[in-house]
């Protein structure tokens, strides 16, 4: 038996045993169903007009056990994809006892034709219990559905990114405040009353409370279940500057290359007006023969420019545009070497300041 089939059999055996021995721990999962501390996906844009089962559904994958991007084993709309495996925790909560919480937010709700501009542009999902859980931050509109895994057909055309991080329970007290600042459009949630004495804001947001005072912005230090350090930048609609130029670059003390959706007549130009500059990425290369324009890419990430003393990578849910400077949203950043190298080698060209 080859390594890949053997690994698949072992992962299936693990889940079979978990049904007997107890519920598997809530964590990010790889394509074999194995728990990982974190993973990142980069869904590639649809680059052909021809009908194809795979077009717009392939993705690059990186996790805490790897050192570089890998082509996914499955398409992103498969329940065997890393997202499909991980989100099974969400769908299992519908059949569990009241010991698991979840919260889903997106300004584009699955099945709706409208977008909620009164809320933040934030997109994400949390599932957790009193031991640990995960936070998925992503750029995909109308995702995920509440009752079963599907990837939206509207998400095939453009590139998309997301990061899943496994956190111990204590970190959800920090995330609780970050969610308040983001002003998320929560379209499904369940938080058992046993969580309420530790979590102040998420239960009230889940109950659609209108009496919450929203801070302008907040920076939180977070630590994954296995100890990887992150910082999370959360801004509300009351912070009306470009989050990249006005805050992230200056706080991290690094020049940034930023990839966000470059929609015509809405993008902000590269900015060198402050001590630390932000340059718009113009094209991305997966291989020497496979590349695409940032206009085909709905992903949102930035990375320190080559030669920087501080080598940061950030992934989030806001574009560099005038409209989104007025929306809530955020970015989670890390100095992990392998994440930095993986993203830094993707950019092909960026725009200089005028």
From Swiss-Prot:
Catalytic activity: Endonucleolytic cleavage to nucleoside 3'-phosphates and 3'-phosphooligonucleotide end-products
Glycan attachment positions: 70, 77, 95, 98, 114, 129, 208, 271, 319
GO CC terms: cytoplasm; extracellular region; lysosome
Subcellular location, principal: other
Record EC number: 3.1.22.1
PANTHER family associated with the record: DEOXYRIBONUCLEASE II (PTHR10858), DEOXYRIBONUCLEASE-2-BETA (PTHR10858:SF2)
Family that this chain belongs to: Belongs to the DNase II family.
Protein name (Swiss-Prot/TrEMBL): Deoxyribonuclease-2-beta
Organism: Mus musculus (Mouse)
